[in-house]
C-alpha cells in the first residue's frame, strides 16, 4: 500500500516531456533600471503573466513560453506606472503584451542552468539569454501535483527595444532582469 502511494504521488516525472502551466500568482518578471544617470535604481515588475514550460528531464531539454501583460507593469508608484505605460516608454496601447520564448539548456545534476531565448518587447524581438540561479521541482503540498520553481537573471539594453526615454538626459539604458517563476504540472 505504501509503495503504491509513493508511486502515485511521486513528484518527479522522468520518462517523457511534462508540461507545466505558469502560476500567475507566484510568477513575477521583475527588473531594475537606472534613474537619472546613476542617481538611483527604479525597481518594477509585471504582475500579470501566463504561459507554459515543457521539461524533459530524461533528455535534458525543455522550452519556455511566457506572455506578459504590460498593463500590469508596476513600479509601486502611480505616476511612474502612468509614465511607463505611455507612448514615451512601453506604449501599452500599441504594444499591450511582451513575450519570451526559449529553450532550457546546460543541464547539470538533472536541472537546467540557462534559458536561450528571444524577448519581444515594444514590438521588437531580440535574443536574450537568462541564467537560472536556482531550480527545483517538488510535490505541491496543497495541489498534490508537481510544481517547479526557478530564479532567473539576465540583462537587456532597453534602447535595443526602442525604449529610449531619458537617454538624452544621461539615463543608463541597461536593465537587470530578476524573474521568479513557479509552474504547476498540467
Language-model features and meaning:
Residues 1-4:
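Sec-dependent signal peptide recognition
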Residues 14-186:
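Low-complexity, acidic/polar, glycine-enriched regions of mature
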Amino acid at each position: 500500500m505504501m509503495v503504491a502511494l509513493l508511486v502515485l504521488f511521486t513528484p518527479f516525472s522522468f520518462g517523457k516531456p511534462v508540461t507545466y502551466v505558469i502560476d500567475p500568482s507566484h510568477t513575477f518578471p521583475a527588473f531594475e533600471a537606472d534613474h537619472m544617470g546613476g542617481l538611483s535604481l527604479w525597481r518594477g515588475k509585471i504582475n500579470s503573466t501566463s504561459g507554459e514550460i515543457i521539461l524533459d528531464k530524461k533528455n535534458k531539454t525543455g522550452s519556455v513560453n511566457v506572455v506578459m501583460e504590460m498593463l500590469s507593469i508596476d513600479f509601486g508608484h502611480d505616476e511612474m506606472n502612468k509614465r511607463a505605460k505611455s507612448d514615451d516608454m512601453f506604449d501599452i496601447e500599441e504594444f499591450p503584451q511582451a513575450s519570451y520564448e526559449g529553450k532550457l539548456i546546460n543541464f547539470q545534476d538533472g536541472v537546467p542552468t540557462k534559458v536561450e531565448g528571444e524577448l519581444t518587447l515594444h514590438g521588437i524581438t531580440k535574443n536574450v539569454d537568462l541564467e537560472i540561479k536556482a531550480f527545483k521541482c517538488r510535490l505541491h503540498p496543497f495541489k498534490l501535483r508537481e510544481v517547479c520553481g526557478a530564479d532567473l537573471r539576465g540583462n537587456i539594453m532597453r534602447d535595443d527595444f526602442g525604449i529610449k526615454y531619458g537617454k538624452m538626459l544621461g539615463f543608463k539604458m541597461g536593465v537587470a532582469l530578476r524573474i521568479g517563476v513557479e509552474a504547476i504540472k498540467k
